Amino acid sequence: HEYQAKDILADFGVDVQRGMVANNKDEAIAAAKKLTEETGTSLHVIKAQIHAGGRGKGGGVKLAKDLTELEIIVNQIIGMQLITPQTPPEGKKVNKVLVAEDVYYPGDSEPQEFYVSILLNRGVGKNMIMYSTEGGMDIETVAENTPELIFTEEIDPVHGLYPFQARNVAFNLGLSGDAYKGMLKFITTLYNAYVESDAS
């Protein structure tokens, strides 16, 4: 589940969206109150926890502006049969949600969503970073229609990630200032988590 993956990444020092898993509306409200104390915002993202991607487009990820909205959304999502392109035709039943802080990458201008992943390129037998300025939810469509908007960095299997490759990622994403520095740290810690947890 997403919440478990985030716990693993956080253990390696990767900055992740804060959140807590909830099995019912009471747990969700308690989680939201605690997150509001920690973050100062009453905006929360409610995310269905199933083993499939495409949850947002299937109605399994929603923004709650207050506790009343949160309760309504949690009641809608928990127990639903969530159908996404990655589930069987009948979907998967949602038994829990992640109540998470509403975040954007802290850029110098308007908030923007990026896609970043580290994966094993089986064709060349090397790990690589794949990334794009064209957000996370529609990356398959981006790859199909505008592949020139997807960048890659092949990682040397002996040396590992070179510092200039992390800089390439931040530069190609158009970042500057604190956002640029933050992305360097993010890429480095994400790569370390990938290697140390043997995620390939």
PLM region descriptions:
Residues E2-L9, T36-G56, P85-G107, V116, ...:
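ATP-grasp fold ATP-binding core
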Residues Q4, A10, Q17-R18, N24-I29, ...:
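Expand to "…catalyze enediolate/carbanion chemistry for C-C bond making/breaking, isomerization
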Residues I8-V14, G54-K57, E148-I150, L161-N172:
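Gly-rich Lys/Arg/Thr-decorated short loops/hinges at beta-loop-alpha junctions or inter-strand turns
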Residues V16, T68-T87, V169:
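Catalytic core of tubulin tyrosine ligase-like
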Residues V16-G19, I46-I73, Y115, D138-I139:
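Glycine-rich phosphate-binding loop of ATP-grasp-fold ATP-dependent ligases
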Residues P88-I155:
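Hydrophobic alpha-helical hairpins/lids featuring a short glycine-rich hinge
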Residues E154-S200:
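Glycine-rich, mobile lid/loop segments that gate access to catalytic sites or pores
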